UniProtKB/Swiss-Prot annotation:
GO molecular-function term, one example from the UniProt record: adenine phosphoribosyltransferase activity
Annotated Gene Ontology cellular component terms: cytoplasm
Name used for this protein in its record: Adenine phosphoribosyltransferase
Organism of derivation: Bacillus anthracis
UniProt GO BP: adenine salvage; AMP salvage; purine ribonucleoside salvage
Description of how the protein assembles with itself and partners: Homodimer.
Length: 170
């Protein structure tokens, strides 16, 4: 399926100079959303995944249906102050600013094979931070899946040594 026809291009959002790739049209089309989810599920099945991890918020949109289809758990990575129990944290930079990500300390058991999911790979800051959280808890990053990669931002360089699936590139 050509997923690009289901991704809206929004110039100057959230800041001037940013060209945002909006996946909500893909989510609004049940067949496209299912096809994207199925592609990631097939990728994950080849990697013997124990747990799916996704950063807030669009990583949830991708990761939850994948974890459901695989019959494995989902662990959210959230911004500081959004998780109610003891967390570990990491500071990170992203395409349009800086932030802190967290995950519950008990979210991942040592040795669990983890699939990280997110909507978009831009500079790689969010995923690099998510990888650090997973690995600090003893998880093994068995795969990383994105709907979209912005190749001109060169975020892939942050993922050397990791197995990556991208459904569409810009």
């Amino acid at each position: 399926m050509d997923f690009k026809q289901h991704i809206a291009i929004v110039p100057d959002y959230p800041k001037e100079g940013i060209v945002f790739k909006d996946i909500t049209p893909l989510m609004n089309d049940g067949k496209a959303y299912k096809a994207a989810t199925d592609a990631i599920v097939e990728y994950a099945k080849e990697r013997d995944i124990d747990l799916v991890v996704g950063p807030e918020a669009r990583g949830f949109i991708i990761g939850c249906p994948v974890s459901y289809a695989l019959e494995v758990g989902f662990a959210p990575v959230r911004k500081l102050g959004k998780l109610p129990r003891e967390v570990i944290t990491v500071d990170y930079g992203k395409e349009y600013g800086k932030d802190v990500l967290t995950i519950h300390k008990d979210a991942i058991k040592p040795g669990q094979r983890v699939l990280i999911t997110d909507d978009l790979l831009a500079t790689g800051g969010t995923i690099e931070a998510t990888i650090k959280l997973v690995e600090e808890l003893g998880g093994v990053v068995a795969g990383i899946a994105f709907l979209v990669e912005l190749t001109y931002l060169d975020g892939r360089k942050m993922l050397d040594g990791y197995d990556v699936l991208v459904l569409e590139k810009y």
